[in-house]
């Protein structure tokens, strides 16, 4: 959610139990303005909160010229002092998946360690090597934020446009989805690099608007039933909840450009979802 409309956006998400104290709201409102100025971001988004045992991580993201690429993630333990997270590389995500388990501790320097025996060769020529993988919690935090963004970050169709030079920008003429369209899952898109779009046929691509339909719709997710779509406040607010990452909520006010998402949870994927559907 955009930091410029933080209070209004938090009020829309509060119906789902996702809220912050008055002190935290006030601190975020001031500190995110400083982050925007110091890092020279075009926009700053409040991403959410990951719950830890000792303390919680508040997450923000800075946006540069391209809304989709090169987003910078930052974390804070007190809503005032912000620190950049390292970029989440494929090797980092793999190490985190291997070594880090259980809940976050709340200590960015906490070290996770995993040791395994790897065997190379066969028979008498086989050699055994002990391999230890170590990751700190700050790296785990960066990997989890990246994974959640890839899996469930959502925007309404038309909220962003892709220019001929490939840059993704906010669509200033977007006035919101019609209430009828807002109730359909196909009008919400994954805000990440497209995956399923590349597999479409030429005939299917010819029916799409390249300026608007450059992302994957939620209706094409392989895991059907992983989204809960509801209309709250007498049908004036459309709310999407992820059942894969419990604590993720997207909201959109139909016929207005107001939309956003927030995650407040323990940072653990719901691996039981396939058995729950």
UniProtKB/Swiss-Prot annotation:
Protein localization: Cytoplasm, Cytoskeleton, Cilium axoneme; Cytoplasm, Cytoskeleton, Flagellum axoneme; Cell projection, Kinocilium
Gene Ontology CC terms, in alphabetical order: 9+2 motile cilium; axoneme; cilium; kinocilium; motile cilium; radial spoke head; sperm flagellum
GO biological process, one term: cilium movement
Keywords, alphabetical: Cell projection, Cilium, Cilium biogenesis/degradation, Cytoplasm, Cytoskeleton, Flagellum
Record note on disruption phenotype: Dysmotile olfactory pit cilia which have a normal beat frequency but an ineffective circular beat pattern. Effect can be rescued by coinjection of mouse Rsph9 mRNA. Embryos with CRISPR-induced rsph9 null mutations exhibit a greatly diminished olfactory and neural ciliary motility, structural defects in neural and pronephric ciliary axonemes and an impaired initiation of startle response to acoustic stimulation.
Predominant cellular place of this UniProt entry's protein: cytoplasm
Pfam family, one: Radial_spoke
Signal peptide interval: none
The protein's assembly and partners: Component of axonemal radial spoke complexes.
Protein purpose: Functions as part of axonemal radial spoke complexes that play an important part in the motility of sperm and cilia. Required for motility of olfactory and neural cilia and for the structural integrity of ciliary axonemes in both 9+0 and 9+2 motile cilia. Essential for both the radial spoke head assembly and the central pair microtubule stability in ependymal motile cilia.
PANTHER family recorded: MITOCHONDRIAL RIBOSOMAL PROTEIN S18 (PTHR22069), RADIAL SPOKE HEAD PROTEIN 9 HOMOLOG (PTHR22069:SF0)
Family: Belongs to the flagellar radial spoke RSP9 family.
Protein name as annotated: Radial spoke head protein 9 homolog
Organism: Danio rerio
Gene designation: rsph9
